From Swiss-Prot:
Induction: Expression is repressed by DasR in the absence of GlcN6P. This is Glucosamine-6-phosphate deaminase. Transmembrane segments: none annotated. The lineage of its organism: Bacteria, Bacillati, Actinomycetota, Actinomycetes, Kitasatosporales. It is an enzyme of class 3 (hydrolase). The gene is nagB. Keywords: Carbohydrate metabolism, Hydrolase. PANTHER family: GLUCOSAMINE-6-PHOSPHATE ISOMERASE (PTHR11280:SF5). The active site is at D67, D136, H138, E143.
Length: 261
C-alpha cells in the first residue's frame, strides 16, 4: 500500500486524474470504477479539464458503477446512475453505452447482484477503482463487519446513512431507499489498481485505522492492505492521525517520476 499526502483536495484530485489519464493513454478502453459523493468530485473535474484540453482521449473509455439504490428508477435524479451520468460521463464525453452498473429495479435483486459481479469479470475487470471512505472505514456500502471476501450483494442502509442521504431527497428521509446494491470487498479487491481518496479531519481516524491498523472486518478499508497495488491519497487533515506520516512524505518525495502512483 502506498500512501500519498497532498496539500488539499484539489491536489489530490489532480494527482488521481493524472493517473487515470496515464492509464487511458496506455489502454484507451480502460474500465474505470467510479464512486459517488463529494470526495471524488475534484478527480472528475480535473480529468474533465484534461479531456477539454485534449490531454487525454476518453472516446473508448468505459465506466463501472460501485453501488446503486434498490427500487429507485434509473431515471430518478438521485439514482447513482443518474448522478454518475451528470458528474462523470457527460463531463468526460462518455456515452451511456460505455457504462455498466447493477440493476436496482430488478425483480430478482440477488440475481441482479450476481449478474453484475459476473459482468465485471466478463468485461476484463476494473483497471482502476476509485473509492472514498466513511468515517467508520466503510468502502462502497460495505459497513463495518462486512466480510472481507464479500461479493456484489444487497445491503440494508443504516438509519444514520438514510438520515445523511436525506439531503439529496429534499430532506425527506421517507424518500431514501432502505437498501442498496454494492460491490463487495472481495469484488473491489479484484480491480488491478485501487485508489482511495480521503479529505478532511473527519476522515483522519478512519484513514489511520485503514492504513496502520490491523486488517479487520471492523474497518472494511483495511482490506486494501492486502491488495498488490493500492494507493491511498489523503490531504494533510485526513493524514493528521498517521504515525508514519513523515515516512510517507519522504518516500513519495523521492519516488521516481516515471512510477506515477
Amino acid at each position: 500500500m502506498e500512501v500519498v499526502i497532498v496539500p488539499d483536495a484539489k491536489a489530490g484530485g489532480e494527482l488521481i486524474a493524472e493517473a487515470m489519464a496515464q492509464l487511458l493513454r496506455r489502454k484507451p478502453d480502460a474500465l474505470l470504477g467510479v464512486a459517488t459523493g463529494s470526495t471524488p468530485l475534484p478527480v472528475y473535474e480535473a480529468l474533465a479539464a484534461k479531456v477539454r484540453s485534449g490531454a487525454v482521449d476518453t472516446a473508448q473509455a468505459r465506466i463501472a458503477q460501485l453501488d446503486e439504490y434498490v427500487g429507485l428508477p434509473a431515471e430518478h435524479p438521485e439514482s447513482y446512475r443518474s448522478v454518475l451520468r451528470r458528474e462523470v460521463l457527460e463531463p468526460l464525453g462518455i456515452d451511456m453505452d460505455a457504462f455498466m452498473g447493477p440493476d436496482g429495479t430488478a425483480a430478482d435483486v440477488q440475481a441482479a447482484c450476481e449478474a453484475y459481479d459476473t459482468a465485471l469479470g466478463g468485461s476484463g475487470g476494473v483497471d482502476l477503482q476509485l473509492l472514498g471512505i466513511g468515517t467508520d472505514g466503510h468502502i462502497g456500502f460495505n459497513e463495518p463487519c462486512s466480510s472481507l471476501a464479500s461479493r456484489t450483494r444487497i445491503k440494508t442502509l443504516t438509519e444514520q446513512t438514510r438520515i445523511d442521504n436525506a439531503r439529496f431527497f429534499d430532506g425527506d428521509i421517507e424518500q431514501v431507499p432502505h437498501h442498496v446494491i454494492t460491490q463487495g470487498i472481495g469484488t473491489i479487491l479484484e480491480a488491478r489498481h485501487v485508489v482511495l481518496l480521503a479529505t478532511g479531519e473527519g476522515k483522519a481516524d478512519a484513514v489511520a485505522a485503514s492504513v496502520e491498523g490491523p486488517v479487520a472486518a471492523v474497518c472494511p478499508a483495511s482490506a486494501l492492505q492486502l491488495h498488490p497495488h493500492a494507493t491511498v491519497v489523503v490531504d494533510e487533515a485526513a493524514a493528521s492521525k498517521l504515525k508514519l506520516a513523515d515516512y510517507f512524505r519522504h518516500t513519495y518525495a523521492h519516488k521516481p517520476d516515471w512510477q506515477g502512483i
